[in-house]
């Protein structure tokens, strides 16, 4: 049995971002994920599951060391945002120029973010990726958890 300080169940974008954020902290981190992500083919058609990454998220992904990898694949700037509720009169819109920014963020396929974080975690000696794997049980001890 392997001993770790932090076990993250779920190697999606959030779980991998947490793991990569803990890199260099001195903690031994394990990430359990049901499947290994498929490599991204450059000629693959764009996927429909995307995230609107704002400037704060860009800074986080830069700090995690994956933003340049993401930009080198597929990312598209967005300059405006409009949000409304179809069942009410609620509506908001804003753009980069009115806020004094060059852009508001980027639209990025979730698989691109996920794969960049997975690759970063794979390169870390502090992070163990366990995939395919599923959590079977958690046992609480007096001084540790199994």
Give names to the regions the model predicted.
Residues 76-146:
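Conserved N-terminal helical subregion
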Residues 45-86:
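N-terminal FAD cofactor-binding segment of flavoenzymes
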Residues 2-31:
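N-terminal Rossmann-like FAD-binding beta1-loop-alpha1 element of flavoenzymes
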Residues 23-48:
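Glycine-rich FAD pyrophosphate-binding loop
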């Amino acid at each position: 049995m392997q001993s770790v300080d932090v076990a993250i169940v779920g190697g999606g974008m959030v779980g991998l971002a947490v793991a990569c954020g803990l890199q260099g902290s001195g903690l031994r981190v394990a990430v359990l994920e049901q499947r290994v992500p498929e490599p991204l083919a450059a000629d693959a058609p764009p996927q429909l599951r995307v995230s609107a990454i704002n400037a704060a998220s860009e800074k986080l992904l830069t700090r995690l060391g994956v933003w340049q990898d993401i930009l080198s694949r597929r990312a598209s700037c967005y300059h405006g945002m409009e949000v409304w509720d179809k069942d009410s009169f609620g509506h908001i819109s804003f753009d980069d120029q009115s806020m004094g920014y060059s852009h508001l963020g980027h639209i990025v396929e979730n698989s691109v973010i996920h794969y960049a974080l997975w690759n970063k975690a794979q390169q870390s000696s502090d992070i163990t990726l366990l995939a395919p794997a599923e959590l079977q049980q958690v046992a609480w001890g007096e001084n540790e958890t199994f």
